């Protein structure tokens, strides 16, 4: 298994994988990451200062990823942990922890002091992982994510 930064040539394979995982998880197609236009161009979306997307690769295939970027329409120091999804074949191996650590370290290096995340009620394993890393539930959405169907909001001080 290898963790690396996303490359332009990853876009097609990554978009297909992310949509497959979202369908498997029963995520609505409207008001979630499923309909994000940037899902088809992850490289371009995260190819800017203060943004980074990491890929998990195993046997020369993309098995998941996670990104960090400034939260749209929020203060300069607030970032969002974004599009953290993994193929079922690699879940339960501690990869989520590795990816959160990579993303949060990048956020700290880039002077963010709060990290926000949205998730779905049925993604209990993900919520437990976020809690383990110090995220706390909040009662309101932040920023302009376009994810009106995501009713679980969490925040962490960095």
Q: Each PLM stretch: what is its role?
A:
Residues 1-3:
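Extreme N-terminal starter segment of soluble prokaryotic enzymes
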Residues 5-82, 87-89, 100-102, 106, ...:
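Acetyl-CoA-dependent GNAT
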Residues 20, 113-116, 120-158:
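C-terminal "cap" of GNAT-fold acetyltransferases
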Residues 87-93, 121-122:
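Active-site acidic-Proline motif in GNAT/NAT acetyltransferases
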Residues 93, 109-113:
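Short coil/turn segments at alpha/beta junctions that flank glycine-rich nucleotide-binding fingerprints
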